[in-house]
Regions:
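Small-residue (primarily alanine) positions within well-ordered alpha-helices
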Residues: 13, 31-32, 61, 65
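Basic/polar N-terminal segments that are highly enriched at the extreme N-terminus
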Residues: 1-8, 139
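Zn2+-dependent cytidine deaminase-like catalytic core
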Residues: 42-137
């Protein structure tokens, strides 16, 4: 991916982060998932008092996209920080999100974990989830 594309996706993730509902952890996460068709879907984390129904930003973006008919993706940007603080660390997807993303992005999905538009790590889902289990395993 070109630097301008990476930065644009990071900006979308920051825009999504503003809508996070995090009254328990106070850690807000934003994600921007790009379909292979170029369409971008934003997601934020949404917490729940009973914790189990809590949904991560990455899966929020993924579920929005799939529910609108998009099922192939090439990149996701993720940002996260404590509420009221600037992003001081990179936030990677949790294990559940890695598995959910693997279903639709496979090991080649580009994963951008960012502190800012200029400070970020670019890797692949295959690096974050080696030997991932996907649809091909069931054929």
């Amino acid at each position: 991916m070109e630097k301008a594309e990476i930065q644009a996706l990071i900006r979308e993730a920051f825009a999504a982060q503003k809508f996070a509902y995090v009254p328990y952890s106070h850690f807000h996460v934003g994600a921007a998932l790009r379909g292979k068709n170029g369409q971008v879907f934003r997601g934020c984390n949404i917490e729940n008092a009973s914790y189990t129904p809590t949904n991560c930003a990455e899966r929020t973006a993924l579920f929005k996209a799939v529910s609108e008919g998009v099922r192939e993706f090439d990149a996701i940007a993720i940002v996260g920080s404590k509420v009221g603080e600037t992003n001081t660390l990179v936030t990677g997807p949790c294990g559940v999100c890695r598995q959910a993303l693997y279903e639709f992005g496979g090991p080649e999905l580009t994963v951008i974990m960012a502190r800012s538009e200029d400070v970020y790590i670019v890797t692949t889902l295959g690096d974050l989830l080696p030997y991932g289990f996907g649809p091909a395993n069931l054929e």
